[in-house]
């Protein structure tokens, strides 16, 4: 009987988690128009760190910021880009949850990427990518986390691609993994491209709405 009760509790818990994820996805997808503006990516990253710091400290995560001086601004939707940064930070912290034999270090870094792009990187000292090809991490509903829904990274990639950028993952030389995205620096051509429809509803770019249309 106790096993049956535990099965029921687990089923209810998983259903509640799925319902919460679906609600958040619908809220994101309901945003019809992006607020396009010039963004200081350093400032955006610092704001994400600030709102995440208490959770990171409770998880014994050491945060290191390596933010480039005189970083060129980027053009896009601040909320969407901060959603991506927050997701990468949370994933990094989660990857280090079981690490006990070394410091749980999370490094967030910004830099100019060539002459016309800006890169943001989140590096952790967690369990790494294992034998899973990095590209699989960006497939909808693929997850390596217990209880995970596998939607955060696909949505993040859709957001970055809608900003004319690229999001990728790679294993570190030592422990952990590195996730980074690169997007164009601000300029008239970028502003025009985004205004003409580059920043549409991210759901439309990956077909994910068909999975959340009903519960």
Where are the regions that the model predicts?
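Histidine phosphotransfer helical core of two-component systems
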Residues: 1-16
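A conserved beta-strand-to-alpha-helix junction within the catalytic ATP-binding
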Residues: 5, 37-49, 109-112
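Short beta-strand-loop-beta element adjacent to the nucleotide/active-site pocket used for signaling
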Residues: 101-120
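Short alpha-helical Gxxx[C/S/T] motif in the catalytic ATP-binding
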Residues: 152, 156
């Amino acid at each position: 009987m106790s096993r049956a009760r535990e099965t029921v509790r687990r089923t209810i818990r998983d259903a509640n988690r799925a319902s919460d994820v679906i609600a958040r996805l619908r809220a994101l997808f309901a945003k019809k128009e992006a607020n396009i503006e010039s963004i200081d990516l350093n400032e955006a990253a610092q704001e994400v760190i600030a709102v995440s710091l208490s959770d990171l400290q409770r998880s014994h995560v050491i945060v290191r910021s390596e933010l480039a001086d005189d970083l060129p601004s980027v053009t896009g939707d601040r909320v969407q880009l901060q959603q991506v940064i927050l997701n990468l930070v949370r994933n990094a912290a989660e990857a280090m949850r079981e690490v006990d034999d070394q410091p749980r270090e999370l490094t967030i870094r910004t830099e100019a990427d060539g002459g016309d792009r800006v890169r943001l990187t989140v590096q952790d000292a967690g369990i790494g990518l294992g034998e899973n090809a990095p590209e699989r991490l960006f497939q909808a509903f693929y997850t390596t986390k217990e209880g995970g829904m596998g939607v955060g990274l696909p949505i993040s990639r859709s957001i970055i691609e809608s900003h004319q950028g690229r999001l990728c993952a790679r294993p570190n030389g030592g422990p952990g993994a590195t996730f980074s995205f690169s997007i164009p620096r601000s300029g008239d051509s970028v502003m025009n491209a985004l205004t003409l429809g580059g920043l549409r509803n991210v759901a439309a770019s990956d077909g994910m709405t068909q999975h959340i249309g009903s519960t």
